[in-house]
Amino acid sequence: PQGVVVMHPATGVPQRIYQAFAKFLAERGFHTITYDYRGIGASRPKSLRRFAARMRDWALLDAEGVMRWARARYPELSQLAVGHSVGGHAIGLCSADWDVAGVVQVACHTGNSRFIRQRGERWRVELILRGVGPLMARLIGYVPGKRLGLGEDLPGGVAIEWGAWAGMQRYFFDDPTLGAIERFNRVTHPVLVYGFDDDPWATPAAINALTMHFTNTWVERRQIAPAQAGGAVGHMGFFRAQFAATLWPGLVDWLSERAAATRAEAVAA
């Protein structure tokens, strides 16, 4: 095997959505691990009402736990990670990333609606994140995300913290209880960042507002137009099988290069 890749999902997106991509990686020599955050998909309890979970728990407990498990299970292999949207946040926030050879961030950005160009979409996102979502979380104990276009239903605590961060100028970097700036400063592994011209949320400015905090590592940016991809990608499309021939090979090549570099460093040592 070339290495092991942990796939960190987006908000409200169950791991099954990444099945085709995980299979693609596995066929090219990577052990690939997918998982669900607490309260989502296979990690959802029978009832989400008053289920205790915050968005930071997805990063500091779930993402970190899976990455540490991968390291313990495959100690001889290069450790790599792919993060989709909030999955990229999780990698930057958790501590286990110190042992990672490289990370790919796909459509990862700060969740500030001010970066959304379309006025109608900006208002819709603000209404959901800072209004309807937190209100429903407090009233019924969870957020019916499927009805609001947020993917899966969300634990109430996740929605409340998400809404609070969305109201901060620098998103969670302004939350003094999280220490996000210090956490991102600790990242020293190379980072590859994908953005898409037709993504209404992860605009170049929103991506920059996140990646600027990787101050101690090398960040490579790839901004893709629909014509280059062979179709509309948006915020959620990268992991669809239709892009297996156009978008996925470049990502896999980068992971392979990072895995090879890590093996070479180990031999030299």
Task: Give the residues covered by each predicted segment.
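Short beta-strand/loop motif that positions the catalytic acidic residue
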Residues: V187, V193-G195
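Catalytic active-site module of serine/aspartate enzymes centered on a nucleophile-bearing elbow/loop
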Residues: Q223-A269
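Short alpha-helix in the alpha/beta-hydrolase fold that links the catalytic acid
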Residues: H189, T203-H213
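Alpha/beta-hydrolase active-site loop
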Residues: A52-R73
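Active-site glycine-rich loops that stabilize anionic/oxyanionic intermediates
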Residues: Q2, P9-V13
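Alpha/beta-hydrolase-fold enzymes
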Residues: V82-R170
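Conserved alpha/beta-hydrolase
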Residues: Q15-S47
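Alpha/beta-hydrolase fold nucleophile elbow
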Residues: R73-S85
